[in-house]
Amino acid sequence: MIEITNYRQGAILNHNHGEETEKSLKVRIEGISDHGCPVMVNGMSAEMDGRRFSADIDLTEKINTVTASTITPYGNYSQELTLVWDKKSFKRYNFYIDDHIFTFTDLAKERPARAFDHFYLKGLKEIHEKYGTVFSLNCFYHNDHHEFLLKDMPDIWKSEFTDNSDWLKLSFHAYSEFPDRPYAEASAEEIGKDWDLVQNEIYRFAGEAAYIPPCVTHWVNIHPSAAQEMIRRGTRCYAGPLRLRVMGGPSLADRQKGGNMTEIQARSISGADRTAETLGLNLHYGFDEENNYCNNHRSYYDPLLKLYFYYNGVCCNLLPVKEIPGRVESILSVADKYNAETFGIVSHEQYTFPYYPNYLPDHMERMDLAARLYTEAGCKPVFFNDGVLGNTIWDK
């Protein structure tokens, strides 16, 4: 057996991992050859140290194949990995906000002269003007709290949305807030129908320039058929695994009627809302290797799906203001150790609205703070669905 040990399948590598020039990224490949026989890495002889081997190779493409092979008296063995060169990488962050329908409901009812006079859009624009933050607003078609359909959103502010589309994008999220996990058992046709409803309305009232494919669906969990349809429609990255899993957060009852947000946030911060109580349950429900890797490295690439998977780490509606600096500092510290440069912020629209049962008066302040902290850490705002998680150098 032979195994490359210092990089995972789909590892995203940047200038911090080796020596970068205009033409290549030179990185060291390390591993173990059980029989201690000579190893070749991409056709070059590796240095041997007992069973251990190492070799310096050049990554010259965005997507690179690395093959380690050995010939032994017992047969021939090889391993192939896909590594991504994040060329001219830079620290960056993506910010998406889920569950948008209240803003459109208000706009249709109030009809202000300018859409960005509405307190919510005005607040986001102020964050953008201070830090350059760009937002993806993931949208519902139906409002489950106050009867409204996205088809009833006026198009009188279309030029305004188009004019701001360089920093504010709208995307599909789900038909409506309820039920939970709407695409866990959905077919391609079912998610496609809902997707078309939302996307067509975005085109109508905001313009095609304001649209971006989603990097997450409602409750994240998604059926394989729905996932394939999502990828076919242009999704290039996803915030966490596609498969069904325990999510945590407010219960259905808490979200419908209101709950104790202090208690909900405390359970989220501690992890008690999603952690298995015993080792046996954790081994059954958990994917520790993937979780540990993403918590450290923040992202990886799946070459079969041609999809980038990444972790956020900061969900503003679940982190009180006093907890956000510590969370961001922890994420940045670990990322520096593992040479990671991609970060994510997420939140949910409804917590900004006084008439929502779980209203958080400081929700906009939380989002402002998260954006400011990543900006002060030298991170640039990007849309992860573009290029290599927001780095578009390979597209130029």
Model region roles, listed by residue range:
Residues 80-161, 211:
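Active-site beta->alpha N-cap acidic-glycine motif
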Residues 134-223, 245-250, 341-344, 349-353:
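Metal-dependent polysaccharide deacetylase catalytic core of the NodB/CE4 family, i.e.
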Residues 147-149, 209, 221-342:
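Active-site-adjacent pocket scaffolds in enzyme catalytic domains
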Residues 238-242, 342-396:
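C-terminal domain-boundary segment and adjacent tail
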Residues 1-22:
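Short, compositionally biased P/S/T/A/G/V-rich stretches that sit at domain boundaries
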Residues 27-33:
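Aromatic/hydrophobic beta-strand junction motif of beta-rich domains
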Residues 56-63, 73:
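Surface-exposed, short loops/turns at beta-strand junctions within beta-sandwich domains
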